[in-house]
Each structure stands twice: as structure tokens, then as C-alpha cells.
Amino acid sequence: MAQSRVTDFYACRRPGLTTPRAKSICLTPSPGGLVAPAFTRSSSRKRARPPAEPGSDQPAPLARRRLRLPGLDSCPSSLPEPSSPAEPSPPADPSPPADPGSPVCPSPVKRTKSTTVYVGQQPGKIPSEDSVSELQSCLRRARKLGAQARALRARVQENAVEPSTPDAKVPTEQPCVEKAPAYQRFHALAQPGLPGLVLPYKYQVLVEMFRSMDTIVSMLHNRSETVTFAKVKQGVQEMMRKRFEERNVGQIKTVYPTSYRFRQECNVPTFKDSIKRSDYQLTIEPLLGQEAGGATQLTATCLLQRRQVFRQNLVERVKEQHKVFLASLNPPMAVPDDQLTRWHPRFNVDEVPDIEPAELPQPPVTEKLTTAQEVLARARSLMTPKMEKALSNLALRSAEPGSPGTSTPPLPATPPATPPAASPSALKGVSQALLERIRAKEVQKQLARMTRCPEQELRLQRLERLPELARVLRNVFVSERKPALTMEVVCARMVDSCQTALSPGEMEKHLVLLAELLPDWLSLHRIRTDTYVKLDKAVDLAGLTARLAHHVHAEGL
């Protein structure tokens, strides 16, 4: 008995070797048009890799074959069966040549023209008219999709170029304005607590500068020292970790003119080598009039009063800008200053213009020799005749009108005025009466929001949390399986289950408000020293949520 070779067992583990299957023109062949391959045995010892059978479970085709256009699904999957697989003949392709820029790449078809065995094609026989028409329709669809893709790409490039045009005009309109960082422009939106008359970021910094400056001045003034700007600058910069300059002092004087008296004095002891005793220095003296009641020292109460006055002056400045903004609306609005509790939602607080610094006393101007004629007149007796002649020639040369030293610098061009804003074209065709009603209703909402007191704002915030709290409260009663629970137990369960971080006392206030709005669903019973909460679990929760939303909408106007 002959010994079996290892290669004899390959036929048992793998499907039989078959002849290479003909590659059709379409990328996805149809199983119905394939012919069962004939099993052949290779004479070589090398194991040939057989192609996959149509009926066997094979992995998904390559990604190149899967990424096809939707229009190619109608391509013919196969051609008629051949009578002689060994006689390949290229088919006659009456369709026009494919566009190289079209999405369908014709390279697989060209590559298989000379090497593919076409199934079911006799020598001298051309494909049917149906397959030719389908190929032509696929090619037309591919060319159409390619043209659409090119048009879309051109449209995207045009849209990318258009936004750069208005940006190039911005530096010509406002060349000196620098855009502030985001944490400064949106500082008012990040303030904790209830919304109110929030100051801009630059005004908040100025308030802190005044507080630091007042603290340093009070310390030096109470010790009977001469307060100079150099001492105050060093102390304020150490407290705030920010630059403090004379411009900031001028802004403080603009906001609070009666806070300090500024003078230029000399012969002030400095105890520093960088500043001479004979130099003029800016001295600061606090004005203790009505705030301190005639006292000679700055106390903590006086500092607090001065800080409140400074902040109130800044608020009044922002109110003036807010009033101008309300007058520019359509229709214009007017809110009394004593009833204003918060800014208009569209009023950008951080875009309020900066405070112009006031003029501070400057050191007296001493006589300085700036021209050659003055030097010649002052030191004529100290110079030799040769030096005197050279200086006189230089003075005459510099006094000529055509000399380059007398040319005046050109004045900066006045920036063009900002054109008025054009009326929006989106409202074209809309009834004017409808627009007036909508604007009047919007004005009513904004007025109610700007004049709302803090208590109403707090109640509105609680109303917005009630729908979620009602759902959590019902789940607590369902899990406890009791008709009534004590207030302490309910508050503890809801604090642990609610997403919003609330204290037990705040949660109890929410439950009292919920019982006030929905007495038929939730009731509170005071028994001895405890308060019991009773809930009707049979009531539909969706209806309760709708009622709470109606309350929020009614009180939010």
C-alpha cells in the first residue's frame, strides 16, 4: 500500500480547485449568472489558491467594491453562459469611452478586456442591446454625479472666499479698537447669584483698584505720612497683581471727583536713590468731608462708605448707556432708574465704553535749552569765537523752512463714519400690524423682566425646578410604598435623588410651593411636632407637568 502524501489531504479540507472565474464588467456579480466551476487538478506540487464558490460563506467584498455609486446597482451582473470557456474573445463595447474625471473609474474594465474570459459569449458575438443600454445609462448617471460634485466644490470655495471680504473692512472702520478676551467680554454672564445690575469686567477691576488704593492711602494718612503716587503704586500692585498707573488714578478721579486732592510737590522725603528730593512728585490727600463726619482719620466705616459711593457712581454710568440702548430699540423703551433691577437681555454690559481719565496735576515746566539759538544766547560768554560761529551756522541752517527738521508730521486720516444699518429684508411681505403686535409683546416681556424684584426671580427659579421635583417625589412615594411620609424623610430622599444640588431646607421650600400649586395631588399635614406629606399616586404625571409649565409661563411674563 502506497504511503499518502501530505498534499493529498488538501482536497478534503478545502473546496476543490476550479478554473479562474471570468470577471464581469459590473463590480458586483450576480450569483444567478455564474456557472458551476469544473473541478481540475493541478499537476504541480504547489497548492493553488482556489476561488470562492458562489454558495459558500465568504467575507464581505473589498472596500473598493463596496464603495459604489447608487446608480451602478442597475448594471448587468453577468452575460450569457459560454459554450467554450477556453476561447476568450473581447466584447464589442459600443458605449462611449468613460470620462476620466467621472466618479466611476473605468480602469477595471480596461484591465480585464484582454485577460477576462467572458461567460456565455461565442466568438464573433456581441452583447445584447439591453446590457449595452444599461451600461450607457450607468455612464450618463456617473457623469451627471461628477458634474454635481464639481459644482458643489466650486460653491463651497466661493462661500469660503466671501466671509473674508467684510473682515478686511473692519480695520479701516475701527483701526484702534482691540478685541478684548472672552473672559472680559462675557464677564457679566459668569457672575454667581441672581442676575442684577452687574458691572462690566473693566469696571469691576476699577472698583478693586479703588479699594486697594483707599486701603494704602488710609494706612499712610493715619500715620501722618505724605502719600505719594510711588508709594500707592507699589502697594496696589502688590495687592492686586496688576499694573497700576496714573491713567487708573485719572479714571478714579473721573468717577469719584471728591475722593482725593492731587498736588505736585517737591522736597518730599522719598528714602530712595531713584527719586531725587528736589523732583516733583504727585501727592494724594483723602478728602474727609461728609463721609467721616469731620474726623481726621480714615476708619473702616469711612472706607466702606467711600467704596459704596464709588460703585454706585459706576452703576449710574452704566445706567446712562443702558438708557441710550433702550431708546435705540424699535419700539423704544423707557424704564425708571429706581425700578430697574437688571439689564436688558440684549444689552451687552461688557461692551460699555471705558472711562476717560481726568487730568492730573503735572509738574511745573522748567526752562530748558532746546534750540541752538537758546544755547548760544545763554553760553555766548563761555564759548570760543570758532565754536560760536559753528553754532550760529547750525542755527541758521535749522531755521530754514525747507529743512527736513521743520517738516510737520502728517495728520491721521479721519475714519469714515459707520453707515446706518440697513433694514432686514427677511421681514419683507409680513404684515406691519403683526410686527407691531409682536414687538409690543416683546417690549412687555422685557419690561417685566427688567423690573422684576429678587423675590420674584427666586420664585421663578423654583417654579422651573418643580416638574423634575414632582417626578422624583412620585418615585420616592412609589419606592417607599406608604401613603404618607414625614417632611424630613421626603427631603432627605429627594436631596439624594435630585440632580440639582439643594439643601434640605431649600427642598422643603420647593415642596411647600408644590403643595400650594397642586393641592389636589400633594398635601401637607401638621400633626404635633412633625409635618407629613401625602401624595395621590393615581393622578397622571403628564397632566401635572403641563399644569406646572403653565404656571411658569404665566409668572414668567
From Swiss-Prot:
UniProt feature, compositional bias: Low complexity: 69-81
Transmembrane segments: none
GO BP, sorted A to Z: attachment of mitotic spindle microtubules to kinetochore; DNA replication checkpoint signaling; DNA replication preinitiation complex assembly; negative regulation of DNA-templated DNA replication; positive regulation of DNA-templated DNA replication; regulation of DNA-templated DNA replication initiation; regulation of nuclear cell cycle DNA replication; response to sorbitol
Annotated motif Cyclin-binding motif, positions: 65-67
Pfam families recorded: CDT1 (PF08839), CDT1_C (PF16679)
Region named Interaction with LRWD1: 463-557
PTM comment text: Two independent E3 ubiquitin ligase complexes, SCF(SKP2) and the DCX(DTL) complex, mediated CDT1 degradation in S phase. Ubiquitinated by the DCX(DTL) complex, in response to DNA damage, leading to its degradation. Ubiquitination by the DCX(DTL) complex is necessary to ensure proper cell cycle regulation and is PCNA-dependent: interacts with PCNA via its PIP-box, while the presence of the containing the 'K+4' motif in the PIP box, recruit the DCX(DTL) complex, leading to its degradation. Phosphorylation by cyclin A-dependent kinases at Thr-28 targets CDT1 for ubiquitynation by SCF(SKP2) E3 ubiquitin ligase and subsequent degradation. Phosphorylated at Thr-28 by MAPK8/JNK1, which blocks replication licensing in response to stress. Binding to GMNN is not affected by phosphorylation.
Residue numbers spanned by region Disordered: 20-113, 397-427
Alphabetical UniProt keywords: Cell cycle, Centromere, Chromosome, DNA replication, DNA-binding, Kinetochore, Nucleus, Phosphoprotein, Proto-oncogene, Ubl conjugation
InterPro entries: Cdt1, Cdt1_C, Cdt1_C_WH_dom_sf, CDT1_Gemini-bd-like, WH_DNA-bd_sf
Known function: Required for both DNA replication and mitosis. DNA replication licensing factor, required for pre-replication complex assembly. Cooperates with CDC6 and the origin recognition complex (ORC) during G1 phase of the cell cycle to promote the loading of the mini-chromosome maintenance (MCM) complex onto DNA to generate pre-replication complexes (pre-RC). Required also for mitosis by promoting stable kinetochore-microtubule attachments. Potential oncogene.
Homology family: Belongs to the Cdt1 family.
Subunit structure: Interacts with GMNN; the interaction inhibits the binding of the MCM complex to origins of replication. Interacts with MCM6. Interacts with CDC6; are mutually dependent on one another for loading MCM complexes onto chromatin. Interacts with PCNA. Interacts with LRWD1 during G1 phase and during mitosis. Interacts with NDC80 subunit of the NDC80 complex; leading to kinetochore localization. Interacts with KAT7. Interacts with ubiquitin-binding protein FAF1; the interaction is likely to promote CDT1 degradation.
Full protein name: DNA replication factor Cdt1
Species whose genome carries this gene: Mus musculus
Gene behind the chain: Cdt1
